[in-house]
Design a protein with these regions (language model features):
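Glycine-rich helix-loop "coupling/hinge" segments at transmembrane-helix boundaries
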Residues: 99, 110-115, 125-126, 140-141, ...
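Generic hydrophobic transmembrane alpha-helix motif, especially the helices
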Residues: 35-41, 45-47, 58-147, 175-177
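Gly/Trp-centered helix-boundary motif
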Residues: 1-70, 74, 78-79, 187, ...
Length: 255
């Protein structure tokens, strides 16, 4: 059964029993009950519904932002590693300019100048977080561009774009997968921090960081507890996946 509500597309029943925007002034600041499993906040909104909906927002920001940073980082890193010379120098200087600013401060500055919506948050995180991916891809290309299969491809006149994206890139993606898992965790933390400070997902759309901020503002301990636990467990899980992928894919750790 699918039901719709204001400022959202859909919710899936019964996972989200109430609209995350629905208020019930009779049931404000309730603890856990049969009707409201995780209780309600100061305006009577069901915390469980807001948490489930907030997970979609926070995870969407994480995945899309990492997708943007991977796209930028892979393209620029591949060009720098394959061509070298002035192309490499130009991209390296661009990377140095970006990383000379504190990451969170740069993202906060970008979001302050953009209209406040979830897509601009994804873009801001994505266009700042690509430098690590670019360096990883560049390093892999520097190692692989002198291999025999690349030399053979050049000898038969294969276009550079095909060599880069069809021959070299698939052989150098292993460290990128590891970086992506850490990137998702980092993006979720950044989005939560932005929402906590009031620069994230616009009100009233719930995200974990915004729920955390609401609980702090109204001095509601249990409202802050649940999103805090969710953020901690999600970020820890992605970091553990990243560690496992690194252990499995990095040949240097098998020596």
């Amino acid at each position: 059964m699918v039901t719709s509500f204001k400022d959202d597309d859909y919710v899936v029943f019964p996972l989200i029993p109430y609209s995350p925007l629905e208020t019930d002034l009779i049931s404000t600041d309730e603890k856990s009950t049969a009707k409201h499993i995780l209780g309600t906040d100061g305006t009577g909104r069901d915390i469980m519904s807001r948490m489930i909906h907030g997970s979609r927002v926070s995870l969407s920001v994480g995945f899309v932002a990492v997708g943007i940073s991977l796209t930028i980082g892979i393209i620029l890193g591949a060009l720098a590693g394959y061509y070298g010379g002035w192309v490499d120098n130009l991209i390296q200087r661009l990377i140095e300019i970006v990383i000379c600013f504190p990451t969170f401060f740069l993202i906060l500055t970008i979001t302050a100048f953009l209209p406040q919506n979830i897509f601009n948050i994804m873009i801001a995180i994505g266009i700042v977080g690509w430098t690590g991916v670019a360096r990883l891809v560049r390093g892999e290309f520097l190692k692989l561009r002198s291999q025999d299969f690349v030399t053979a491809a050049r000898a038969i006149g294969t276009p550079a774009s095909r060599i880069i994206f069809r021959h070299i890139l698939p052989n150098g993606l292993a460290p990128v997968f590891v970086s992506a898992t850490f990137g998702v965790a980092g993006a979720i933390l950044v989005e939560s921090s932005l929402s906590f400070l009031g620069f994230g997902v616009p009100v009233p759309t719930p995200s974990w960081g915004q729920i955390l901020s609401d609980g702090r503002t109204n001095y509601e301990m249990f409202v802050t507890l649940y999103p805090g636990i969710a953020i901690f467990l999600t970020v820890t899980s992605y970091n553990l996946v990243g560690e496992a992928l690194r252990d499995a894919l990095d040949p240097r750790l098998k020596i």
